[in-house]
């Protein structure tokens, strides 16, 4: 009986923790203008807070598997929840943009460990016969988080106070730690092997300095010279890592996986696509609130339409892929997605609410098909023994791309406003940013068009072999 309870409750615990992380990743976007006023900053400068969270997620993902093997999955998962709760408290108590940015990075680190280690727990604790049902639990946060986050954040910001957004995580986190201690066994590997610390310092440090340096070019927190130096040092560290990874047998992030055609197209093409998609959750609430004068809750009601569009498309994705194949879908759908993103730049004060909602809905509908296609095909030609390491590389690139999207959007928005001579954001300042990030998603066609016509057939049609050209 106790084993049955543990087999049921372990996936529920992990799913709840993932839901907390998924909601938190989306909850602040509708609160950004109000937070900016509280910190005495321009709303665009809060891009650094969004970027720091994504960065915390990205740079720590590669070490999560090793930590779980070395210290035990339960111990790391429990610590991850604790770090996330501490980060939430720090966010709620922040009195400046600098402290809030650091707090969001801490949250990102906790979130980075929660998701992959949670999957490890499911794999080790749940019986194989129950594995599919357990994974279904884990799919719920990915679907509901993007919808619940903007709604919850908008409601709390409009009718209560934005700081209360982060207090929600505290009781949930404490309960999660208690349930983890009670129901999840602390499994570990007897011989985890060494961690590539040199690779971790070079890749994590390089990515952090490069992305944060770009985000700080507006001169709000540091001087432009300091931001430029950070960016250059980060780029140099990443370059050194590329040379280092070629000479090490098992580097932390094995760049040799890019030699696999489907992996290369999915990750590199997906990176361009995610630059566009990563910017939308940042830009959309700003244009709705600062440009069109909506409240945080009103913008949340519209922003969540994207998540509903994504949910609907997921029910059709398998059928679409079987009918047209990965290459065709990835190419045409990237174009549709880029157009849908750019269309958000057409919003002006007289735009009907129903039309805005429809465009945002389509802005979630087409990207959901793209993500499903990319995620399904990424590891199609990777040997099963290498999937774990390939996943680490793919996950890091994905997160960095999302953060880069926010940074690019913020830079374009700042330039446009300066050209227009606006002291505060106006609706007319946003269209160039939407067009630029929409073009980034559109440009992913240049990578995915190199795929063979039958790429991914093994997945959608059950073929044993895939021929690539």
Regions found by a protein language model. Name each.
Residues 158-269, 294, 302, 437-438:
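Hydrophobic transmembrane-helix bundles of small-molecule transporters
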């Amino acid at each position: 009986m106790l084993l049955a309870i543990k087999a049921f409750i372990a996936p529920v615990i992990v799913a709840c923790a993932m839901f907390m992380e998924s909601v938190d990743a989306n909850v602040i976007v509708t609160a950004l203008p109000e937070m900016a006023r509280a910190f005495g900053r321009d709303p665009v400068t809060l891009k650094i807070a969004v970027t720091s969270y994504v960065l915390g997620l990205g740079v720590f993902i590669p070490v999560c598997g090793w930590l779980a093997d070395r210290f035990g999955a339960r111990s790391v998962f429990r610590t991850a929840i604790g770090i996330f709760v501490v980060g939430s408290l720090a966010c709620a108590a922040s009195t400046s943009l600098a402290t809030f940015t650091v707090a969001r990075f801490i949250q990102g680190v906790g979130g980075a460990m929660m998701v992959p280690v949670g999957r490890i727990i499911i794999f080790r604790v749940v019986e194989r016969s129950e594995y599919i049902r357990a994974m279904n639990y884990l799919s719920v946060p990915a679907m509901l988080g993007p919808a619940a986050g903007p709604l919850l954040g908008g409601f709390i910001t409009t009718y209560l106070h934005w700081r209360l957004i982060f207090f929600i995580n505290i009781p949930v986190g404490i309960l999660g730690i208690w349930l983890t201690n009670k129901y999840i066994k602390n499994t570990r590997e007897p011989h985890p092997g060494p961690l590539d610390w040199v690779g971790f310092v070079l890749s994590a440090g390089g990515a952090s300095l490069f992305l944060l340096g770009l985000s700080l070019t507006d001169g709000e927190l540091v001087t432009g010279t300091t931001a430029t130096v950070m960016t250059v040092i980060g780029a140099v560290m990443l370059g050194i890592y590329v040379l280092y990874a070629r000479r090490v047998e098992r580097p932390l992030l094995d760049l040799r996986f890019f030699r696999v055609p489907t992996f290369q197209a999915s990750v590199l093409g997906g990176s361009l696509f995610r630059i566009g998609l990563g910017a939308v959750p940042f830009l959309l609430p700003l244009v709705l609130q600062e440009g069109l004068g909506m409240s945080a809750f009103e913008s949340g009601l519209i922003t969540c339409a994207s998540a509903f569009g994504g949910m609907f498309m997921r029910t059709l994705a398998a059928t679409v892929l079987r009918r047209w194949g990965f290459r065709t879908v990835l190419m045409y759908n990237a174009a549709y997605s880029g157009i849908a993103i750019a269309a958000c730049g057409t919003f002006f004060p007289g735009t009907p609410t129903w039309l805005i909602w429809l465009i945002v809905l389509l802005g979630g509908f087409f990207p959901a098909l793209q993500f499903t296609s990319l995620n399904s095909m990424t590891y199609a030609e990777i040997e099963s023994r290498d999937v774990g390491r390939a996943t680490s590389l793919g996950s890091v690139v994905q997160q960095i791309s999302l953060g880069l999207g926010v940074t690019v959007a913020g830079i374009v928005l700042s330039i446009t406003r300066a050209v227009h001579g606006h002291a505060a954001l106006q609706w007319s300042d946003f269209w160039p940013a939407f067009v630029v990030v929409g073009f980034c998603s559109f440009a992913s066609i240049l990578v995915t068009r190199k795929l063979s016509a039958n790429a991914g057939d093994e997945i959608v049609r059950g073929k044993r072999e895939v021929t690539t050209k």
